[in-house]
Amino acid sequence: DGWPVRIIAKGDYPMKVFVAGSKNISSLNSEVQRRLSSICEKGYSILVGDCYGVDSQVQEFCFHNNYLDVSVYANNGLPRNNIGAWPVKTIIVTASVKDFEFYSKKDAAMCRDADYGYMVWDGRSKGTLRNIADLAEQGKMTLIYLSPIHKTVHVQSKEELEKLIAVCPAETRALYSKIELQPTQISLFD
């Protein structure tokens, strides 16, 4: 099903999967729900943000399936959504950081903390593409559900991501070029 099998040794921790996606995706189809069920069945920890769209839909899925191993990441400890009243991972962000960069701090923390990624992407979301790029930079496997074509692909390196971007529409290639020009959101001092 695309997920690595890992035997959890005594004193080890469950795999952490950063699950995120586009804000304009308001429901999860059966394929995405099947993948989420697989994550839950394997006992992986789910790291999710507090935004509307895919974040809140993943929270709804976990809540309705009584899945408890969820951490909600929120800037300054104030989640916009926490449907299951799960533990909140606070990401401190100064008042001088605004807009996209404000929310990307939380995403950077989830990229850093996760072992794997699962992204539900509309092919246009800058934030989701930034997460995929950051996970690839760290050599972390990411399953990407491409909602426009209903297909799942694997990416684990910048080279694999660039091959994917090369077959995307011009709009997506331009978006990736913009992201590549920005410094990575990962910092040793975050």
Placement of each model-derived feature along the sequence:
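Acidic/glycine-enriched connector segments
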Residues: 25-181
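Short, hydrophobic/glycine-enriched beta-strand segments
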Residues: 15-23, 49
